Regions:
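Conserved redox-active cysteine motifs that mediate thiol-disulfide chemistry
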Residues: 1-16
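Structured loop/turn residues at secondary-structure junctions
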Residues: 2, 42-43, 121
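Conserved short-loop catalytic and cofactor-binding motifs
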Residues: 5, 38-39, 66, 94, ...
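Loop/helix-junction capping segments adjacent to catalytic residues or to phosphate/diphosphate-binding pockets
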Residues: 7, 45-48, 123-127
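Structural microenvironment flanking redox-active thiols in thiol-disulfide oxidoreductases
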Residues: 12-78
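Thiol-/selenol-based redox modules, centered on thioredoxin-like
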Residues: 80, 84-148
Length: 148
């Protein structure tokens, strides 16, 4: 996450999430109903301490978690659940290049942890995501008022 060399990938996603964080912070009626999570595929470099540094640098205004795992094996069940594949890129001499190949996916989950939308590179726009968050919250409020 923190070592991604593709400026149109993880760094762009972080910038969009940062903008969403700011948009949420301007809406006190919904900011405490949303949690943002950034998850690293690279536990070797993205240690808990490194992720804490990134969080401090981003200065989130909302509930935004920067997550990593102990090992790649620990992360694999989560990746499998979300159908997210990643692969280390190897150099010709057999050493790891330090890079990963993956499709950028950002997931919008509802309060029951159901995937409600998946944003890819071309559709990860802060206003679009914010509108989808508002739509989910409206839907949840309507369901809550209908429940006995």
């Amino acid at each position: 996450y923190t070592s991604c060399a593709d400026v149109g990938g993880c760094p762009m996603a972080a910038a969009v999430l940062h903008r969403i964080d700011r948009m949420l912070s301007e809406r006190p009626e919904i900011r405490n109903k949303v949690t943002l999570m950034s998850v690293s595929f690279d536990p070797e470099r993205d240690t808990p301490a490194r992720m804490a540094e990134i969080k401090q640098a981003m200065q989130p205004k909302t509930d935004w978690h920067f997550l990593t795992s102990r090992t790649a094996a620990d992360l694999q069940p989560v990746l499998d659940d979300f159908h997210q594949s990643i692969a280390k890129l190897w150099q010709e001499d057999g050493t790891w290049s330090g890079l990963f190949r993956h499709v950028l996916k950002v997931f919008l989950l509802d309060t029951d942890h159901n995937v409600r939308n998946i944003y890819s590179l071309g559709f990860f726009n802060p206003q679009l995501v914010f509108n989808d968050i508002e739509t989910l919250l409206i839907e949840q409020n309507q369901q809550a008022t209908r429940s006995p």
